[in-house]
A protein has these predicted regions:
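Catalytic pocket-lining loop regions of alpha/beta-barrel enzymes
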Residues: 139-140, 152-258
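Short, surface-exposed amphipathic charged segments that create phosphate/polyanion-binding patches used
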Residues: 126-132, 246-249, 301
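Mid-to-C-terminal alpha-helical segments outside catalytic/metal-binding sites
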Residues: 1-13, 22-83, 88, 253-258, ...
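Conserved, mostly hydrophobic/aromatic
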Residues: 16, 81, 132, 166, ...
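Active-site gating/metal-coordination segments in enzymes
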Residues: 87-88, 92-181, 185-188
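Alpha-helical packing segments of well-folded alpha/beta enzyme cores
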Residues: 73-80, 84, 96, 128, ...
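Active-site neighborhood of phospho(di)ester-bond hydrolases with catalytic His/Asp-centered motifs
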Residues: 12-16, 91-92, 114-115, 206-210, ...
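Active-site environment of divalent metal-dependent phosphoester hydrolases
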Residues: 20-22, 96-99, 120-121, 148-149, ...
Length: 302
């Protein structure tokens, strides 16, 4: 097993950071409109039953009583980023995302704008993407297929309109795949659906989020098959990274795996970067995983 190769001198690019914490964390999930059970509706973080030590939450398992009134926006993120050598982080902008907009305006050298459109909005979602790309330097589209109401599967025609625009504007799509943590049906996020999308859109850059479980072996085959398909590690504590993904990165897939965290939604950056030191990536994989692959996918000039 490869151990002890984590580089302390590589500044990371985090492809998933939120902007709100504490009771305001619920606002991170304003787009998750399909929750039905009362227990989930009472949660600040709708998948918190899966996590312990959720930052600034006394609702999750093993809470340590951390204060419930943390700063928000850049004041929340930058101290954690700085002490863990995270140079850049991708955050959400768009309607009802004032914190994200302010973070981009105040710290354009630290935050990367992404946007999660609602495919159910039809042409309006397309117009919003075009406007954000034109006026605000939009770098990526994000998607949570199981989280919409009605749900919009990965291969739905409503998504195809967005994929077509992403190809036109050269925007990558970061899309949740696999069983979702929130208590909504998983069918829209079956990993097998990605295969048809990559076939129909050979110029589309597609990055999976949230693990692709229980179909990790399948996504490994698809990563090998499709040159523009990537995998990001969002929502997984490093000690739980799938072995198949670590093995793939260490063999044929060093260019296809991107670092993504889950701060402050479910994981602390301090915990993530402590646990990363024990992930058995080969030395040559780390710079690509932490930084270089994201720079390439997002077209960054850093």
């Amino acid at each position: 097993m490869t151990t002890g190769t984590f580089p302390t001198d590589v500044a990371a690019v985090d492809t998933m950071i939120g902007t709100r914490a504490g009771p305001n964390a619920k606002l991170n999930y304003a787009n998750l409109t399909g929750i039905r059970d009362a227990d989930s509706k009472s949660m600040n973080f709708p998948a918190q039953y899966m996590f312990k030590d959720v930052p600034f939450s006394d609702q999750a398992r093993d809470s340590d009583g951390e204060p419930q009134d943390p700063p928000q926006g850049a004041d929340l993120c930058l101290p954690f980023m700085d002490r863990n050598n995270v140079q850049l982080a991708m955050i959400g902008i768009g309607p009802n995302k004032s914190e994200g907009r302010a973070m981009i305006d105040q710290h354009p050298d630290r935050f990367i704008p992404s946007h999660e459109p609602d495919p159910n909005d039809g042409p309006e979602s397309i117009r919003t993407i075009r406007r954000l790309h034109r006026d605000d330097g939009l770098r990526a589209i994000t998607a949570f297929p199981a989280g919409r109401d009605p749900q919009v599967p990965i291969d739905d025609p409503k998504m195809y309109a967005i994929y077509e625009l992403c190809c036109e504007l050269n925007l990558p799509v970061f899309c949740c795949a696999g069983i979702p943590g929130p208590r909504v049906p998983f069918a829209p996020q079956k990993v097998e659906l990605i295969d048809q999308v990559m076939y129909d859109f050979p110029d589309l850059t597609f990055v999976t989020r949230h693990g692709c479980e229980p179909w990790v072996d399948l996504v490994g085959k698809l990563l090998l098959k499709w040159p523009n398909l990537y995998y990001s590690t969002s929502a997984f504590a490093p000690k739980h990274y799938p072995k198949a993904i670590i093995d793939y990165a260490n063999t044929r897939g060093a260019d296809k795996i991107l670092y993504a965290g889950y701060f402050p939604m479910g994981l602390s950056l301090d915990r993530i970067f402590t646990e990363l030191r024990d992930v058995p990536f080969k030395a040559e994989v780390w710079p690509k995983f932490l930084r270089e692959n994201a720079i390439q996918v997002l077209g960054l000039d850093v």
